[in-house]
Structures are given as C-alpha cells and as structure tokens.
C-alpha cells in the first residue's frame, strides 16, 4: 500500500477499509469494518498506515488481496496482524504510539516504467529482452521458491546487460510466504552475482512502490 511509503512522521493512525459486499446491500460487511476502524483509530492509536478487514488490522505495506469473494479479503503472509478485534480487542504486532512532534512529510510518488516478469519453465529470453528494450527503469523478477531461476546462461547474460545499463533488477518470490535467499541454491546465487537485488519478504505491491 503506497500510503505507507508516502506518509512520514505520522502522529495518528491511518486506516484503510472497505467491503466485499456493497454498502447498499443488507448483508454488507462495510458498516462493521468502518465502525471498527473508527473505534480502533480512536482508542488504539497505532500510528502507521493500516488495513482493516474482517476483524483484523494489518500493516498496510505487508498486506495483499488474498480472496476474491470471501470476507477474509486480505492477508499479511509474512507478518501477523497488528490487532484482532473480537469480543475483546487484542494487540498482536501493533504497538500503541505516542504522538510525534515532527511535521508530517508527504513523499511524492510518480508513475515509473517498471517491468514485471513471472518466470515459468521454458520462458523465452526474447520475452525478457523485449521488456527491457522498453524505457524501463526497474525489472521485478517473480522467481521460484527462495529466489531461483531457470539455469539459462542466455537469460543471465540478458539480465547482466540490463543491470550494467542501469536497470534495477529485484528478485521477488512467486510464493506469498517466506523470504528470498539467493545464497540457498546455485541458480539463485547466479542472479546475485550479476547484480540482482533480493526482495527479501516484500510483497509485489510493496516492491513496485519502493
């Protein structure tokens, strides 16, 4: 969630919420999500950008849309919820914050040409070449497991040339849980040697924003 990177020195919570069923419908989850978000913001001031859905408050830049048609619409694969709201409200990863006296900083985020490549067996090097021929400033590789890629020297040469040309290349796993470790296997280590940066456990959305 880009707000997490745009708003610095927050002195109050910013909570984003919504609904899976439109608010105009009788069974909408929107009213409960909104009321709980307001109550939590007023009484449990976790001064960061959060996402509240279905009784859970997630860190904004750690959350992903996980379900298309369930009330558990969002998840945070690599970080427990900040807070859970049941009969009682329970802090988990969240911490009640003291107000800060620093002025709010609003970082400007402008659209950037970024390529995303989802690796698969037999992927053509020409496909990657065509992407980096465009005026891209960065390339995100969706790799296997802990950051592995096909053992393809032509692809490595292509990525190395892109890195030498100033294109930032980040390795993000296709897995939603766990972290990239390019030292774990030879194929991942080969990416590291040509200058590919580890995305660690960031979501694709957070990587694109950064």
Model-derived features: where do they sit?
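Short Gly/Thr/Asp-enriched flexible loops that form oxyanion-binding sites at enzyme active sites
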Residues: 1-12, 151-158
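C-terminal non-catalytic interaction/assembly regions of soluble proteins
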Residues: 146-210
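Accessory alpha-helical/coil subdomains and C-terminal extensions
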Residues: 59-146, 151-152
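Short amphipathic alpha-helical segments and helix-helix/interface helices
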Residues: 4, 38, 128, 156-160, ...
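Internal gly/pro-rich beta-alpha loop/helix module
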Residues: 16-86
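Glycine/charged-rich beta-loop-alpha catalytic/anionic-binding loops adjacent to active sites
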Residues: 11-22, 190-195
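Short coil/turn connectors at secondary-structure junctions
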Residues: 9-13, 44-48, 53, 79, ...
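Short beta-strand segments
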Residues: 15-18, 50-54, 118, 142, ...
């Amino acid at each position: 969630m880009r707000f997490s990177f745009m708003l610095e020195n927050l002195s109050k919570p910013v909570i984003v919420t919504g609904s899976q069923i439109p608010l105009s419908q009788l069974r909408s989850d929107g009213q409960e999500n909104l009321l709980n978000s307001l109550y939590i913001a007023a009484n449990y001031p976790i001064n960061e950008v959060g996402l509240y859905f279905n009784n859970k408050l997630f860190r904004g830049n750690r959350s992903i849309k996980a379900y298309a048609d369930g009330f558990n619409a969002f998840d945070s694969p690599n970080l427990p919820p900040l807070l859970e709201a049941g009969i009682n409200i329970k802090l988990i990863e969240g911490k009640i914050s003291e107000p800060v006296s620093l002025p709010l900083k609003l970082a400007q985020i402008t659209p950037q040409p970024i390529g995303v490549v989802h690796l698969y067996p037999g992927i053509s090097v020409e496909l990657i070449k065509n992407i980096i021929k465009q005026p891209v400033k960065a390339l995100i590789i969706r790799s296997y497991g802990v950051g592995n890629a096909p053992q393809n020297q032509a692809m490595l040469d292509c990525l190395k040339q892109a890195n030498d040309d100033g294109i930032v290349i980040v390795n993000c796993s296709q897995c939603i849980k766990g972290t990239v470790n390019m030292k774990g296997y030879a194929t991942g280590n080969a990416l590291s040697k040509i200058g590919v940066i580890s995305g660690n456990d960031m979501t694709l959305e957070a990587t694109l924003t950064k």
